[in-house]
Regions:
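Short beta-alpha junction loops
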Residues: 156-162, 189-192
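Conserved beta-strand signature within the Rossmann-like core of class I S-adenosyl-L-methionine
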Residues: 148-157
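Class I S-adenosyl-L-methionine-dependent methyltransferase module
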Residues: 6-102, 106-116, 126-130, 137-144
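Short, small-residue-biased leader/transition segments that mark boundaries at the very start
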Residues: 1-5
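Charged helix-capping and loop-helix junction motifs
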Residues: 135-140, 167-171
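Short acidic, S/G/P-rich loop/turn micro-motifs used as interaction or catalytic elements
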Residues: 126-131, 159-161, 217
Length: 262
């Protein structure tokens, strides 16, 4: 199951945000063998050669193409789901897809008990602590699926250190209460971020990846890629701002945040 972006493919226009993001990444990653050999780099560089950036659902379909029985996509916006269906039809080979035009939190929670333990959930919202009309959040989806033994990968973002601290507390307390102590959580944050003011907006100033029930190899790769991204962005600029990053890891055993300037 996957929450989705509005579109499958984004047309690139060399905006400052895109220059700081995908263009900078592809240029710098080309010099690093691990990043250059990553599937993300290979798929995006191929698509970017035609001036297009692959969105989250498109990547999911291409990355998991040969390894799964089907995709389930949830979105409140019908247009987003129609875009997914169109993209799927244009692929030479793709597993069956099913779309659900409903609230993705309640929609996924409803079908979770009927899904196999081998299910992989990619949860890609913006606000993971925002309650829906029934009082449920995206983190509730992750904890419920994790307790059923399913693999989960959740993305979250923040614009200030205050927001980050609120989310860190929310995540660690929610997981602890659910009895989930084994997880991987890695954040990449612009050094330009401030405590309670937004000084610039390249799209997001800090983002985190929270993974549960993944293999030790996958958990290790999240940390490896995090360190690699910090390294290649060490001299980056976004407009007149410092574009360098630091990596913060939320410990999976003690629920203690460790700030690491790598």
């Amino acid at each position: 199951a996957s929450d989705v972006y509005k579109r499958q493919i984004y047309t690139m226009a060399h905006t400052p945000e895109q220059e700081y993001g995908i263009y900078y990444f592809l240029n710098e990653a080309n010099e690093d063998v691990i990043l250059r050999n990553s599937l993300y780099y290979q798929l995006e560089s191929e698509s970017m050669a035609n001036g297009n950036y692959l969105g989250s659902p498109a990547l999911a379909m291409k990355v998991l193409n040969n390894d799964i029985k089907g995709h389930l996509f949830f979105d409140l916006e019908k247009g987003a789901l129609e875009n997914i269906e169109t993209f799927a039809r244009r692929q030479a080979v793709t597993p069956p897809i099913k779309t659900f035009n409903c609230d993705s939190v309640d929609g996924v929670l409803k079908i979770l008990p009927s899904l196999p333990k081998s299910t992989f959930l990619h949860i890609d919202p913006y606000e993971i602590d925002k309650r829906n009309n029934n009082g449920h959040t995206y983190l509730d989806v992750l904890t419920s699926a994790t307790k059923l033994g399913m693999k989960c990968l959740l993305w979250y973002g923040f614009m200030t250190i205050n927001e980050k601290q609120v989310l860190n507390k929310y995540v660690s307390e929610k997981l602890s209460k659910a009895g989930i102590n084994d997880y991987a959580c890695s954040e990449l944050i612009m050094n330009a971020i401030k405590k309670d003011t937004v000084v610039c907006n390249p799209g997001i100033l800090g983002s985190g990846i929270l993974a549960t029930n993944l293999s030790p190899k996958s958990d290790a790769m999240i940390q490896t890629y995090s360190k690699k991204l910090v390294a290649i962005y060490k001299d980056a600029r976004y407009k007149e701002f410092d574009g360098s990053l630091y990596n913060d890891i939320i410990s999976k055993k003690q629920n203690i945040r460790i700030k690491r300037h790598l």
